[in-house]
From Swiss-Prot:
Protein name according to UniProt: Conotoxin S4.3
Modified residues (4-hydroxyproline): 17, 22, 31-32
Domain comment in the entry: The cysteine framework is IV (CC-C-C-C-C).
Disulfide bonds listed in the record: none
Residues carrying covalently attached carbohydrate according to the record: 7, 9
PTM summary: Contains 3 disulfide bonds.
Residues bearing PTM 4-carboxyglutamate: 3
Modification Pyrrolidone carboxylic acid occurs at: 1
GO molecular function: ion channel regulator activity; toxin activity
An example Gene Ontology CC term for this record: extracellular region
Length: 34
C-alpha cells in the first residue's frame, strides 16, 4: 500500500476492503450526502 490514494476497486483507503469509494473519502473532504 502507499498513502491515501483512492483505491476505488481494492480498498476504500483502508476502511472497507473491496468497497468502491470516491477519493474524497480518503482525504475526508466528502460533502455530507443524506
Amino acid at each position: 500500500q502507499k498513502e491515501l490514494v483512492p483505491s476505488k476497486t481494492t480498498t476504500c483507503c483502508g476502511y472497507s476492503p473491496g468497497t468502491m469509494c470516491p477519493s474524497c473519502m480518503c482525504t475526508n473532504t466528502c460533502p455530507p450526502q443524506k
